[in-house]
Swiss-Prot record:
Lineage: Bacteria, Bacillati, Bacillota, Clostridia, Eubacteriales
Species this protein is from: Clostridium perfringens (strain SM101 / Type A)
Binding positions ((6S)-5,6,7,8-tetrahydrofolate): S109, L110, L111, P112
UniProt KW keywords: Protein biosynthesis, Transferase
Top EC category: transferase
PROSITE patterns: GART
Family from the record: Belongs to the Fmt family.
Protein name in UniProt: Methionyl-tRNA formyltransferase
Entry's EC annotation: 2.1.2.9
InterPro entries on file: Fmt (IPR005794), Formyl_trans_C (IPR005793), Formyl_trans_C_sf (IPR037022), Formyl_transf_N (IPR002376), Formyl_transf_N_sf (IPR036477), Formyl_transferase-like_C_sf (IPR011034), GART_AS (IPR001555), Met-tRNA-FMT_C (IPR044135)
């Protein structure tokens, strides 16, 4: 059986390793090397590193859909499966039609919820209690293909996007192996997505990171968790941009304008919101490292009564 793998970041690495160990992988497609670090030296993707360690041929098309010679090489491989995990490119129909059993994508949400580029972040931002991975047969739409298998994961009250990323990353490979075996054994019936249940998870940017203090403390807490470790929720203290890395929710009302700092102690900075109180536990000012409030107030002052914007 021939498997071609397409993926790029850390998230795709455990999936690639699982496929190598279980079935073997014929070829790997990944994004071109990019400048990294302060020296801007070209660095290879995490997926490329693993492929080279296992002596697997690597292809790095700038845009696969615009490279007919590369597509022809892919056709000549006659793959049974093309497995796609965070590749970072849209596959044209010409590629989707190549493998015997189709192109299978691992998507980090319980489809049809949270189609798009940042599903695990938006699952937390929107306050979901359960998410997971879905394997699906790819079509020309954006995460619209028929679903194959799902693996559910609980989102705990203080789980961050970084923590959820690592859980889904590690569990993705096992789900892909089960999916491939299920297809080969005729044990899986593809299921169409219910369009009425869809919602989208657009790419993250710094615009959505600005905290709206008129929201409830729970909604802000979800935003903080969903944007940790990147791009990190932001607010302004005396026109200074402050990153908010960790928070908790306290029940109760302050009757103060949303954003008003109502108390400061070593356990955190208590801030009035549209509903309940948000306690900032870890923060970061410009040109400084992130600190717990207990550390921060040793050398800095946060004034009660100031309004965060």
């Amino acid at each position: 059986m021939k498997i071609v793998f397409m993926g790029t970041p850390d998230f795709a690495v455990p999936s690639l390793k699982s496929l190598i160990n279980e079935f073997g992988v014929e070829a790997v497609f990944t994004q071109p090397d990019r400048p990294k670090g302060r020296g801007k030296k070209l660095g290879m993707s995490p997926v490329k590193e693993v492929a080279l360690e296992h002596n697997i041929p690597v292809y790095q098309p700038l845009r696969l859909k615009n490279e007919p010679e590369t597509i022809e090489e892919l056709k000549n491989m006659e793959p049974d499966f093309i497995i796609v995990v965070a590749f970072g490119q849209i596959l044209p129909k010409e590629v989707l039609d190549i493998p015997k059993y189709g192109c299978i994508n691992l998507h980090a949400s319980l489809l049809p919820k949270f189609r798009g580029a940042a599903p695990l972040n938006w699952s937390i931002i929107k306050g979901e209690k359960v998410t997971g991975n879905t394997t699906m047969l790819m079509d020309v739409g954006l995460d619209t293909g028929d679903m194959l298998l799902k693996d559910e994961v609980e989102i705990t009250d203080n789980m961050t996007a970084g923590e959820l990323h690592d859980i889904l990353m590690e569990r993705g490979g096992e789900l892909l192996v089960r999916t491939i075996k299920g297809i080969l054994n005729n044990e899986i019936t593809p299921e169409k997505q219910n369009e009425e249940e869809t919602c989208y998870a657009p790419m993250l940017n710094k615009e959505i990171a600005k905290i709206d203090w008129s929201l409830s403390a729970q909604d802000i807490h979800n935003l903080v968790r969903g944007l940790n470790p990147w791009p990190v929720a932001l607010t302004s203290y005396d026109d200074i941009t402050m990153k908010v890395h960790q928070t908790r929710v306290e029940k109760g009302e302050s009757n103060k304008e949303p954003g008003t700092i109502i108390a400061v102690d070593k356990t955190g900075i208590k801030v009035s919101t549209g509903k309940d109180i948000l306690v900032i536990e870890k923060l970061q000012f410009p040109n400084s490292k992130q600190l717990f409030v207990e550390q921060f107030i040793n050398g800095n002052t946060i004034e009660v009564g100031k309004v965060l914007k």
